[in-house]
């Protein structure tokens, strides 16, 4: 489909160019006669009017220069840090090149129509800001324009190049910083609208507790329960929150069959779940948190959370680093645009509650994507790599510093040093970006099989009777075997022996570790 679209676009554009239709509208084909560039005077009058508030824009430009410099440092250090992670990422989890392209329709994470809307706004804001700061510095704007490949993929403001060369360095830095700086402002505004206006108005549509995750091969998953279901009843007992769920589950026992009522995308459904043993689960996966009372208790294999906590974390993303990271990565969690299983959980209230639900969710999604793409455009353009804005800002900044530190140096020598530094930095940034794609494929980790296993000579016996335990059947390159016998005694070794002085039910826990301290846990129930 994409290939047919590509052929149709290129063929149609070249036909229109050959027939002279593009020239009539100040259009031309560039980059292999495949991309359409449109130059226009539209918008010049707006730029002229807005730029008359010279002092205001100069002060704003000063703030943007400082802000972009800080973002530049942060982004470069982030790329360096990400480069070091290549050795820890599984080869199978390598980033697809498509994920590095911020264009809707090509990047699978960015939805087409929300993406086009947000990208157009980001480009218009970015380029108009360049134009405004050009006029503030009395630099002529020759033209404005769009670069299109069926839909807009770029925009530009074309200042007079000769006048730009004669600008003071700080004024030119303001001009370049205006693009990413204005994108960050728009990102902040629409983040506020999304979080503090739209999401903050959400309230749970029904009482219940949200299924946050489902453990494979346990009762809930085997019965058909899935994440994002709202659990409303367990064994005919009403569940209003996570505390109710815990209290009800603590009254159940392993092997019990319970009825679970849920709302799935707003539709009521019933499930019968055979409960597993809670103690066994914790011994296998979280032995450090295991307590004796857990053994024999029912375990559904469902992690739950109150729905309002989900909405609160999105309404207040700055409350913690984890919330902010979750907020920015919503598209990768398949939570933006909001899916049906999310919208069914909440109802808009307050002033925005008068908006029809369908329009409310469209607005909320639009606000998020305008925030997200402006943030990405701003952060990317702040990178210290020509032809990005950050690269030009870095060049002027270094030139200014050399002028103060090495005032005796000739202008030609300064230019040579700056050009060399800028080239090295641009190549470094490009390498770091490409390394995110190819690095894990070259040096990433291979799949590792780790499966601890206990072979017990007997599982039932008398006090003082000797039990033998053998871990040689474990899968993996283990180097240490640590045993906990549940009575306060421990041992180390592939094969061990133990006897208990008192009767009771014990769980023997084996923690097997490899040379890199990766571990696998196994347990065995022993009756004395």
Give short role names for the model-derived ranges.
Residues 43-60, 162-175, 408-414:
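Cytosolic juxtamembrane amphipathic/interface segments immediately preceding
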Residues 112-156, 163-208, 366, 420-425:
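Internal alpha-helical transmembrane segments
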Residues 221-244:
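Conserved PDZ fold ligand-binding element
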Residues 86-110, 264-379, 393-429, 437-446:
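Functional transmembrane alpha-helices
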């Amino acid at each position: 489909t994409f290939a047919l679209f590509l052929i149709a676009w290129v063929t149609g554009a070249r036909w229109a160019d050959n027939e002279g239709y593009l020239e009539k509208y100040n259009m031309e084909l560039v980059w292999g006669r495949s991309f359409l560039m449109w130059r226009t005077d539209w918008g010049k009058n707006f730029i002229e009017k807005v730029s008359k508030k010279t002092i205001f824009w100069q002060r704003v430009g000063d703030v943007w220069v400082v802000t972009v410099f800080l973002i530049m440092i942060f982004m470069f250090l982030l790329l360096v840090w990400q480069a070091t992670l290549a050795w820890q990422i599984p080869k199978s989890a390598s980033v697809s090149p498509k994920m590095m392209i911020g264009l809707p329709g090509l990047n699978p994470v960015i939805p087409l129509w929300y993406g086009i809307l947000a990208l157009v706004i980001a480009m218009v804001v970015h380029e108009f800001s360049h134009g405004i700061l050009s006029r503030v510095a009395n630099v002529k704007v020759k033209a404005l324009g769009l670069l299109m490949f069926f839909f807009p993929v770029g925009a530009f403001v074309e200042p007079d190049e000769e006048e730009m060369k004669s600008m003071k360095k700080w004024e030119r830095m303001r001009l370049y910083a205006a693009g990413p700086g204005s994108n960050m402002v728009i990102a902040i505004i629409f983040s506020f609208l999304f979080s503090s206006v739209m999401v903050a108005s959400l309230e749970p549509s029904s009482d219940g507790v949200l299924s946050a995750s489902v453990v494979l091969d346990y009762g809930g998953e085997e019965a058909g329960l899935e994440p994002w279901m709202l659990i409303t009843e367990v064994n005919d007992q009403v569940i209003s929150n996570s505390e109710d769920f815990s209290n009800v589950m603590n009254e159940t026992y392993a092997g019990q069959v319970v009825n679970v009522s849920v709302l799935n995308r707003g539709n009521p459904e019933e499930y019968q779940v055979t409960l597993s043993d809670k103690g066994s689960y914790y011994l296998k996966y979280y032995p450090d948190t295991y307590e004796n009372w857990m053994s024999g208790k029912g375990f559904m294999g469902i992690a739950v959370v109150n729905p309002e906590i989900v909405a609160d974390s999105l309404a207040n993303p700055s409350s913690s680093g984890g919330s902010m990271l979750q907020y920015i990565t919503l598209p990768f969690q398949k939570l933006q645009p909001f899916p049906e299983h999310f919208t069914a959980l909440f109802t808009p209230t307050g002033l925005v509650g008068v908006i029809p639900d369908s329009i409310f969710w469209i607005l909320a999604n639009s606000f998020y994507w305008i925030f997200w793409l402006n943030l990405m455009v701003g952060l990317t353009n702040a990178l210290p790599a020509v032809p990005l804005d950050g690269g030009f800002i870095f060049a002027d900044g270094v030139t200014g510093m050399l002028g103060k530190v090495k005032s005796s140096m000739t202008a030609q020598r300064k230019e040579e040093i700056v050009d060399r530094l800028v080239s090295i930095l641009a190549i470094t940034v490009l390498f770091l970006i490409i390394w995110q794609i190819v690095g894990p494929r070259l040096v990433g980790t291979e799949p590792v099989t780790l499966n601890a296993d206990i072979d017990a000579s007997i599982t039932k016996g008398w006090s003082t009777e000797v039990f033998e335990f053998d871990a040689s059947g474990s899968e993996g390159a283990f180097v240490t075997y640590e045993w906990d016998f549940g009575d306060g005694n421990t041992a180390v070794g592939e094969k061990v022996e133990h006897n208990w002085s008192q009767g009771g039910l014990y769980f023997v826990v084996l923690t097997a570790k490899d040379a890199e301290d990766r571990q696998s846990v196994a347990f065995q129930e022993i009756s004395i």
